[in-house]
Curated annotation (Swiss-Prot):
This is Inositol 1,4,5-trisphosphate receptor-interacting protein. One of its GO terms (molecular function) is protein kinase inhibitor activity. It is a single-pass type I membrane protein. Pfam families: Mab-21_C. The gene is Itprip. It comes from Mus musculus (Mouse). Belongs to the ITPRIP family. It is found in: Cell membrane; Nucleus outer membrane.
């Protein structure tokens, strides 16, 4: 009963609560409120979007500033590192420069260790020198020199007199056809080389004569040294160019443009393009005239052709006076000539056209263009600077201060003899007689006069070979005159040469390893063969000496 009453009450209460009049419907205004809410939500969403964009921009700006700051820091670090590197590089360069200067001073002031001591110190070094290869003793050297070298002095004198007389006649024939307006004027010859320095031992004897020539008026030669330009490559050191100028110093075109030339005259001016030029004042009157309007430098090849043609003309004028023939000799030696006698014997000699450098004893000489190491073909406008006259004068001046019968030339003659025999045995190497003479000149300047007594021939010969050995091992043999401040001022060497950078004659060995290896091997083999070779020639002295040259027959 109670349960039924409770159910009835629950139904009544539920009906009252759900009656619409008691609780009005709240969603009657939903349409207006919903639009407002949606609008506000959209506005809020727009604000959120704008805020998001602002935050994104702020983040991007902060990241950009951070990246810029990082780049600035990196650049600053790189700059600091670069500055530190430049500082270290500069310090290293300064240090290397100081070391090089000290090394140069040390090399100028001292010589290889085998040159510094006296005879006792030298003999005490024993096998450390020249790979322990022994040289002949003094008695053997004296005997060899007296019987194989000194005895040929008379032949050298007679040969020299004969060649000089013939060359005088040849030059006189050239001068007889001289045209003062177009021809080069040839001056008197100058004797140079081993024949005129009294140490030649190679057979057959060969005289070497310089023939200076000058251009016709109003032209002049203006030498240009290699050391006047900072951009001169190493292979051009020791060379120069010859510019043809007017008397007032202004460069001008070739002589053939101003005068009528003979058919066999060559224009000697250097130029890139060769061939026949259009007809103009003189040039158009002959075909194939080797003349250039683009440059005023003398060309080595053209001068050689001109000189050979001039010698040929001169010989044809005087050939009837002599009972021998004259022919050109070695093709790779400009001015090489050979007198051929009817008996079959011959007498070689060299006539080299040269150009004097101002008023000095320096001469620019012909040298055929060669392929430099690692470069293109050499220019034929470059002339080799020769110190031959200064070398002859230095040996003469030094010889006067040495004891009577000094052994300096004897050392050079024996060394030259050994080198020539080794060359015939194994072929040519990178070592020449000029290197031997350069080494001797350095020794003469470094040692006292008393060290060159005749009784010290064996010690001085060992000095010479020790010097060459050290130079070969270091690949450095400096030219005696270029940049050498120790050369006596009495020689009158031009200041431009004294101030020049030293020239390393062994520089090719740095680039040509095969040549260097062959030269070193040949040098030590020469020393190894020296005792046996000298003993052999001392025992078997030739009984038949070279006969003096036939006298000229004048018809």
């Amino acid at each position: 009963m109670a349960m039924e009453l409770f159910r009835v009450c629950l139904v009544v209460v539920t009906a009252i609560i759900n009656h619409p009049l008691l609780f009005p419907r709240e969603n009657a205004t939903i349409p207006e409120n919903e639009e407002e809410i949606i609008r506000k939500m959209q506005e809020h969403q727009e604000k959120l979007r704008l805020e998001q964009l602002r935050l994104e921009e702020e983040v991007s700006r902060l990241e950009a500033e951070k990246e810029a700051l990082r780049q600035v820091e990196e650049e600053q670090q790189q700059l600091e590192a670069h500055t530190a590197w430049d500082l270290w590089t500069t310090l290293c360069m300064v240090l290397f420069l100081i070391i090089e200067v000290l090394r140069q001073n040390h090399q100028e002031g001292t010589f290889p260790e085998c040159l510094g001591g006296d005879e006792d110190e030298l003999s005490g070094l024993g096998g450390t020198l020249l790979q322990g290869l022994p040289l002949p003793n003094r008695a053997t050297l004296d005997h060899f020199y007296e019987h194989c070298i000194r005895s040929t002095t008379g032949d050298a004198t007679r040969t020299q007199e004969f060649v000089e007389g013939f060359v005088d006649d040849l030059l006189e024939a050239l001068r007889s056809t001289y045209n003062g307006k177009t021809d080069m004027e040839l001056e008197d010859f100058i004797g140079v080389g081993s024949m005129y320095e009294n140490w030649q031992v190679e057979r057959p004897l060969r005289c070497h004569l310089f023939i200076p020539f000058i251009p016709p008026e109003p032209y002049s030669f203006h030498p240009e040294f290699w050391c006047s330009s900072l951009s001169t490559p190493l292979e051009r050191q020791g060379y120069g160019q010859i510019k043809v100028t007017l008397a007032d110093g202004n460069p001008l075109g070739c002589v053939c443009g101003k005068a009528k030339l003979e058919e066999d005259m060559l224009c000697l001016l250097y130029g890139k393009n060769r061939g026949a030029w259009p007809s103009s004042a003189g040039c158009g009157e002959m075909e194939g005239l080797l003349c250039s309007r683009e440059s005023s430098y003398l060309d080595v090849m053209q001068v050689m052709k001109w000189f050979q043609m001039a010698l040929t003309r001169a010989w044809h004028r005087i050939a009837h006076k002599y009972e021998f023939d004259l022919a050109f000799g070695e093709l790779d030696t400009p001015g090489s000539l050979k007198i051929k006698f009817r008996s079959g014997k011959s007498m070689p000699f060299i006539l080299t056209p040269v150009i004097q450098c101002n008023d000095s004893d320096l001469y620019f000489i012909l040298q055929l263009p060669k392929e430099p190491c690692g470069g293109g073909p050499a220019s034929s406008a470059h002339w080799l600077l020769s110190f031959a006259v200064y070398e002859r004068e230095f040996l003469r001046m030094t010889g006067k201060a040495l004891p009577e019968g000094a052994c300096h030339l004897s050392c050079l003659q024996i060394a030259s003899f050994l080198l020539s025999k080794q060359t015939r045995l194994t072929g040519p190497s990178g070592l020449s007689d000029y290197h031997l003479k350069t080494a001797l000149l350095h020794l003469l300047l470094s040692r006292q006069a008393s060290d060159w007594k005749a009784s010290k021939l064996d010690v001085r010969l060992q000095d010479l070979f020790c010097f060459l050995e050290r130079s070969l091992l270091e690949k450095k043999l400096y030219h005696f005159f270029m940049g050498n401040h120790k050369v006596p001022e009495a020689l009158g060497l031009p200041e431009v040469v004294r101030r020049a950078e030293p020239l390393n004659l062994f520089r090719p060995f740095v680039l040509q390893r095969t040549l260097y290896r062959n030269t070193v091997d040949s040098f030590y083999e020469m020393l190894k063969n020296a005792p046996a070779l000298i003993s052999e020639y001392s025992l078997h002295v030739p009984s038949v000496r070279a006969s003096p040259p036939p006298k000229a027959v004048v018809s």
